[in-house]
């Protein structure tokens, strides 16, 4: 190998900050592999314009950048106050009234956007407002009114979120707005579609059906942010198996299950998703201080590094790039931390699933290739010649310090593999098949500077290049 590649990928959120001063190009140049469009904000026209710009810049820079559309999900929030904000003291009585109109809130009461809240709570439940900064204990429920007492005081302003400690709010995962946004996602041609607040696998299956009906074949991302989704191993598996990608959305999830539980859940989700051949994104407040500061805190550095050590495919930036003062600097800082963490030898130790039966020939080839790569002295890279990107995903589920090159003629496949840990997408097309095509691919990587003469590489491919799911061959070649 002639160059060192970052294995952990970076997801960046688009917003006003990336719209100005050529920041979008700077962010992609700094190392963004996936861009996230938050459908909570902006019009369909805004999203289409940003997507077009991303593709234009990616082509200009010779990069493959995936586009992730993030559905808003149910709005479980307080309504608005007359003065815009109140301060609640410990011991205050406070009413949540589903019948109260917007702008009528005060120090004693406020409306709620989610009209099903009174049916979801009972006396003794703890409600967490504004990510837990204000906490209320339910005293009584009368019709559409929830009477509470303040147990943790503080300021409360318009439209702050409501969570229930331990989960249990029954709001549907997909709203009418989400269904409209799925059509926008289809129009844009997003590579990934994130579903907010799924309660179970069926929520994700429903989203997938709606997406297909709209003409959107994006991979489905499960944003794990409800306590119900992680309350047991079966619940966790149900969500993971129904998705293509898992996002550890630590904000709402941490509020519902409590911060002490979050550490173990993050590690369990990442570990289990990799076992089940799913990709993983770790998100929320990873470099929050860089919204206003040019350097991350040491705690943020450790947080990103620990996610890398856990085995995450990608780490995500939200407000840091969408609305921060230093969007490209934040991406560059995160890239440096990832590279630093990837130097630690333990994360490259093979964890082969030798006790697990493989589901298909493709998986058997991917696992055997990685076993050979990790045990044959002198191997410098793995090359997957892929139509769908599936083999690249499965090879990347096995820990290794070796780069994996996903080589495909399909732009969408290359964009999808931009998310996968350790995978570098490279455009490749050939009229040849078999060993001739494999040699051609190896020579292309050598000419691009990824390989050097004398390198030993492992290639996976099918008998015919243009057939999806046909991977059935592993070759070991020496670069000429």
UniProtKB/Swiss-Prot annotation:
Residues annotated as binding Mg(2+): 225, 252
Recorded superkingdom: Bacteria
Associated pathway: Carbohydrate degradation; glycolysis; pyruvate from D-glyceraldehyde 3-phosphate: step 5/5
Cofactor: Mg(2+); K(+)
Keywords assigned: Acetylation, Allosteric enzyme, ATP-binding, Glycolysis, Kinase, Magnesium, Metal-binding, Nucleotide-binding, Potassium, Pyruvate, Transferase
Modified residues (N6-acetyllysine): 351
A GO molecular function held by the record: AMP binding
Listed GO CC annotations: cytoplasm; cytosol; pyruvate kinase complex
Binding-site residues, K(+): 38, 40, 70
Documented activity regulation: Allosterically activated by AMP and by several sugar phosphates. Belongs to type II PK.
Pfam families named in the record: PK (PF00224), PK_C (PF02887)
Family: Belongs to the pyruvate kinase family.
Protein name: Pyruvate kinase II
Annotated gene: pykA
């Amino acid at each position: 190998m002639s160059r060192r590649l970052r294995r952990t990928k970076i997801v960046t959120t688009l917003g006003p900050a990336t719209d100005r001063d050529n920041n979008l190009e700077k962010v992609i140049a700094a190392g963004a592999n996936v861009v996230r469009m938050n459908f909570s904000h902006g019009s369909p026209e805004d999203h289409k314009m940003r997507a077009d710009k991303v593709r234009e810049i990616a082509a200009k820079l010779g990069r493959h950048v995936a586009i992730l559309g993030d559905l808003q999900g149910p709005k479980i929030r307080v309504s608005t106050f007359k003065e815009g904000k109140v301060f609640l003291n410990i011991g205050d009585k406070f009413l949540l009234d589903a019948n109260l109109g917007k702008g009528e809130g005060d120090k004693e009461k406020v409306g709620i956007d989610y009209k099903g809240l009174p049916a979801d709570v009972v006396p003794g439940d703890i409600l967490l407002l504004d990510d837990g900064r204000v906490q209320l204990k339910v005293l009584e429920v009368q019709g559409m009114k929830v009477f509470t007492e303040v147990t943790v005081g503080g300021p409360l302003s318009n439209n702050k979120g409501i969570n229930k400690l331990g989960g249990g709010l029954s709001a549907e995962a997909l709203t009418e707005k989400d269904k409209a946004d799925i059509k926008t996602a289809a129009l844009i041609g997003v590579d990934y579609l994130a579903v907010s607040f799924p309660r179970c696998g069926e929520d994700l299956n429903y989203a997938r059906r709606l997406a297909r009906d709209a003409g959107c074949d994006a991979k489905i991302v499960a944003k794990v942010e409800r306590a119900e989704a992680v309350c047991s191993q079966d619940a966790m598996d149900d969500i993971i198996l129904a998705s293509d990608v898992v996002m550890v959305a630590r904000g709402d999830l941490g509020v519902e299950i409590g911060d002490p539980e979050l550490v173990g859940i993050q590690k369990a989700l990442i570990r289990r998703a990799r076992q089940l051949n799913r990709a993983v994104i770790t998100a929320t407040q990873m470099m929050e201080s860089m919204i206003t500061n040019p350097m991350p805190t040491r705690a943020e550095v450790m947080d990103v590094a620990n996610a890398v050590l856990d085995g995450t495919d990608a780490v995500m930036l939200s407000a840091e790039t969408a609305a921060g003062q230093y969007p490209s600097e934040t991406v560059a800082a995160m890239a440096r931390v990832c590279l630093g963490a990837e130097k630690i030898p333990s994360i490259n130790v093979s964890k082969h699933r030798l006790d697990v039966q493989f589901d298909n020939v493709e998986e058997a080839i991917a696992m055997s290739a990685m076993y050979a790569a990790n045990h044959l002295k002198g191997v410098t890279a793995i090359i997957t010649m892929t139509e769908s990107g599936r083999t690249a995903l499965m090879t990347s589920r096995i820990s290794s310090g070796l780069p994996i090159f996903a080589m495909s003629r399909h732009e969408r496949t290359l964009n999808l593999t931009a998310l996968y840990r350790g995978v570098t997408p490279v455009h490749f097309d050939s009229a040849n098949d078999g060993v001739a095509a494999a040699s051609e691919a190896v020579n292309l990587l050598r000419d691009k500077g990824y390989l050097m003469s004398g390198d030993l590489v492992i290639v996976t491919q099918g008998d015919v290049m243009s057939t999806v799911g046909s991977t059935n061959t592993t070759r070991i070649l020496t670069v000429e």
